[in-house]
């Protein structure tokens, strides 16, 4: 499911409603520009799903689109005991990368075994619907360790301080020439990281926080509802308005 843009949400709601959102418990991780790969254990072995597809990849798919073979090969190489630990009603969602250079971002490194565990879908009894989505960083870290992949790095977790809220609103208010001037000396990536964690000096797959990133995932817990947003540069958003050819690797 696509993430709602935080800037769009900020522009569309009343100030009081947005401030109320900022008062909720917050979790921030980096948004990686990568492919999506889902994995689920069934009676006859693991099934692999591309992007948002409900049908698993079959042998013909894998022959035509060999892009996913490195990721699939990683799971084929895991010991049986680790595979057997995977609950059959859980569908594990991963960011998947085989090259440091993506559509318009060049990272310094690749994730562990090319995979980042970003979420886990808990399915209903007949496995046709998603009952809930697990994004708890502690659960993801545990399963990433079991499956020998990377887990999301938590940039911030807790209640935002007033100065953080002010910095965030300042970034969300920027657009056009004002944004270009703001990010001329220090990039959007630098400013975004510093909103949530002033001691951060390294991005998830970059050696510093000055290089471009795809954005941040900013989540707020309202009661029992988790609201997930993407925070991206207004310059990137303006560029994405222009149509471009889709790439199977980044759907």
Identify the function of each model-found stretch.
Residues 1-251:
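Core nucleotide-handling region used for phosphoryl-transfer chemistry
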